Amino acid sequence: FFSSRRRHTRYPLVTGVQTCALPICYDVIVLDAFSGGSVPVHLLTREAFEVYAAHLKPDGFLVVHVTNAYLNLYPVVMRQAESLGMGVRSRFQEKDPERFTRENIYMILTRDQKYLQSFPSVDPPIRDAAGRVIGARALDIPGVGLWTDHFSSITPLEWRE
């Protein structure tokens, strides 16, 4: 954040969760607040996603880094995309100890049909005992309700150990 200010970049970096902090309209909004131990639920509600969508250009992208130490947040974001009529593509990044990266899952929400038709999802692989890819792991879970400012439940979510 501070280094981008020193470099006088031409791309504004908006921090904070205040909805009034977001000017209209962005090409891309990135949510990256879920990789720790706690989940800021207020950022995953219908009302929050309506604000994000209102500040996107019609063909804009909402990128959500859903990697979390304990919970599979993919179905929560999927329900939000469905409620907004947005398409979803997922991007999985395998861990790479040499590059000091860990496994990450990103969800890209958009109404841009050209993008949705051109780029398939990249989901986490399922590997056999020899390490060969034999399929892709499904990330969505049926039965997870739409989170709102008045309702959210982690009970149906997949827990990680």
Go through each PLM region and give its residues:
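Soluble small-group transferase modules, centered on the S-adenosyl donor enzyme superfamily
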Residues: 21-23, 39, 75, 79, ...
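Short "lid" loop at the C-terminus of a central beta-strand within the Rossmann-like core
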Residues: 35-36, 67-71
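Redox-cofactor binding/interface segments in oxidoreductases and associated redox assembly factors
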Residues: 30-31, 64
